[in-house]
Every structure is written in structure tokens, then in C-alpha cells.
Amino acid sequence: MKKLTLLILSVISISLISCSTDLQTNSCNGYQIREKNFNYPHKIRFKMQRNKKIIVFGDSISAPSDFSWINQFEKKTGCIVINKAVNATGYTFRPYNYTETTTKTILDSDLEDIDYVIVFGGINDIQFNRIPENIDVAFRRCCHKIRTKKVISIIPLIIPDQDNYSTNFDAKTALQIRQNFYKASDDYGFTIINAAMFDIERSDGLHPSVSGGKTLCNEIIRALQEK
């Protein structure tokens, strides 16, 4: 089985409230998943090798479009990207189809022949005020599946002043979800990228423009090569 070396986090959803001893959990609803008895390797460098297979999970930031960061990523790295991102999704919900969530997509995917995994997200679960504890359980289930792999978590900037996008959320929920992502990634030895740390031009106030996609691509590659 090939070793996966990367993942980028996304908030995509499905109501997962079941207990799991595999997750080191003491609580069915999630907030006590805090036992850190993992022993995973430190970060490893991303090698720019052509024909490496990368699978991408996430929401509309990565979903197929006329232009996305993925197009540039393939051109610059020579990697083969398998895109499994779904629009309007989150870890514990999807407004139109509850089976199409990032969590379920990750858990159902065969990663045996994949070299790297990238997961995006952060906006949808926050936007719809999903319960942080449930998102934490769902995300940790994803982490557990790829626990021997490397993860880079991208938490997109939340934009509270947009009329049509991220308006329906409160700061406390956003902070809890972000902290849970950081904590889970730290527990599993994954790397975090916070997209709010660099300026991404947006075509509609939320989704990256052509220029924004290039910036995102470059920042992802840069982050992968840092360690």
C-alpha cells in the first residue's frame, strides 16, 4: 500500500454522532476526543514528481470549474489530480443530499493507489451554524482513516459582510470549529494552512478568481515544500 503524504482540510458535512473506540473517543457526541496517544511521524517534504496521484476532497473552492487552483497545480507539479470536491457541502451536512458530504466521500474512497490527499473547507459548516462537536467527530473519523498519512489543513477566510454567502454564522461557532480543526490536526501530526493568512482575489466575494486560484495554488505548493 502506497504511503499518502498530504491532506488539506475542508468543512463538509454529514450527521455523524456515533461512538467509535477507533477514534480514541470517550463521548458519543465528540468533545472528549482528546486523548493524545498517537505516535505519527513528523511532516515530510512534498516532492515535485510527475504523475504522482493526488485526490482532492472539499467544497466549491475546489469543485470542478472553468478555472480552479487545481488546473494550475497540475501544470506546475505534473501531478495527476482526482477531484472529488462537491459544491455546497460540509462535514456533517449537505443541503441537497445528506449522503454527499466530505466525511462520507473520504470514508468511502479507496486511497490505496493515491500518493497524496488534499482536503479543503471551513465555510459551509460555519455558515449554517453546524454543531462544532459533531463536526469534530466527523473530521476525526476522516483523520483516523488517513492517520498514517500527512495532512495540510486549509481553513478559508470567513467573510461576514457578504449578503449572499457567509452571513448566517456567529463568531463563537467559527472559532470553535477552527480550534477543533487545529487540535485534531495537531493530534494526528498533520500540518495546518490557514488561507486567511494570504490574500486571495475573489470573483464573487467568496470563490477565488482566476488570479486568486493562482495565488492559492502557489501558496499550497509553498506550504507543502516547507517541511
Where are the regions that the model predicts?
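Alpha-helical scaffolding segments of alpha/beta enzyme cores, especially the outer helices
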Residues: 134-137, 141-145, 176-183
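N-terminal secretory targeting modules
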Residues: 1-57, 61-66, 74-76, 107-115, ...
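Conserved SGNH/GDSL esterase-like catalytic core that processes O-acyl groups on lipids
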Residues: 47, 51-56, 61-137, 172-175, ...
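Substrate-gating cap/lid alpha-helix
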Residues: 159-196, 210, 219-222
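Short glycine-rich catalytic loops that host catalytic nucleophiles or stabilize transition states
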Residues: 84-86, 195-200
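Conserved beta-strand scaffold positions in the cores of enzyme catalytic domains, especially
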Residues: 54, 81-83, 151, 189-194
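Active-site segments of SGNH/GDSL-like serine hydrolases
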Residues: 120-124, 145-174, 196-199
